Amino acid sequence: MKKTFFPAHLIGTVSAPASKSEAHRRMICAGLTQGETMLTGFMDSADMAATMRCLGALGSTFNRDGDTLTISGMQGKIAKMPVMDCGESGSTLRFFVPIALTVAGGTVFRMHGRLGSRPMDVYRDLFVPRGVRWYMGVGADGAAELTVRGKMEPGDYVLPGNVSSQFVSGLLFALPLLPGNSTLTVQQPVESESYIRMTIEAIAASGIEVQESSAFSWRIPGHQQYRSRSCHLNGDYSQAAVLCCAGALGHDITVTHLSPVTTQGDRAILRHLMALGATVEESDNHIRVKAGKLHGATLDMHDCPDIAPILALTAQLAEGESRLTHCGRLRLKECDRLAATVEILNLLGGNAQADGDDIVLHGVKQLRGGVTLPNYGDHRMVMLASIAATKCEQPIEMDGIEAIDKSWPEYLKVYQMLGGKCE
């Protein structure tokens, strides 16, 4: 699907969608119980559907009533080698590999888009020496497939810290279910620490005990059971970051449903925007970011890589030079987001470059626009383009807009409600 985005002024109040990261985790905890759990504030997306399919393959059932999702946990016997379609969701795939080895003795994971090429060697290197059979192949329809067979056993597990935190979270979900005690150690320095803390928070809320013996080293008792714990899902700072950056660029947007008490690392968006010179007003779970005299800054993305593209746009329109550091993980997303961000900004008339794992931006006063952007197949690039267009002299065109369905299907409606123009 192709859309044209036009220069515009955005104004209004928006409720942040439910945190996708929290929803993944709470759904999995609910699915691993044998009871019923209600999650309110739930929002559909392609990634949520992927996690629901995988839980369904393990026997969970779902009922939707408005924004309330009721999950009935695993019931009855699990099919031998169930098939789990992960769509393009890296979180879903990496969370469920240890879970499937624990409760099903293996499975066939189906992967679409770039997911089949995203790194999985961390698990392969961890599990194959422990007797798990691991096979990457291609299904009859051309989709990538990963087949794993075997059982996880209690023991001492060590992961490097410079890999996706999703691998750590997958083990944290599964290890408490094993018939014996285990330890999990993540070697420092650790990437995306906040996401690990979010997983520990979610499993603890479901009655799982994890004992931190030292920094990034946990003792995890076995024979544990997940307990039902209904909750209201918090707003998503990762998605809200797009609107907060729009505010820093001169639009007048208030975002609600954002708790100041959160393990979401992407709350760093507020700190980073203030470092660029924006003003942040926060009260009663409402956030309003106002434009100041934006200036260059050095911003560390190691714990919040998902907000780097939209921050790069904001820094591109600030005076002076900015540098976004530790952006290497962007290369391993739905597209190479580091390269795509630099390419988009330069096509629009900016001055950006990749310097190793950093993005360097030389500020410009105005973006030109007037171009057709490639189809990146990435929801973050769609949101980046839509906000960039509001600050361009001429409209911009982009193909592959349907990628937005992966995380925020209602985004374009929200964008237009705020005054954004696209057709």
Label the predicted regions.
Residues 1-423:
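Short, structured segments at the rim of ligand-binding sites
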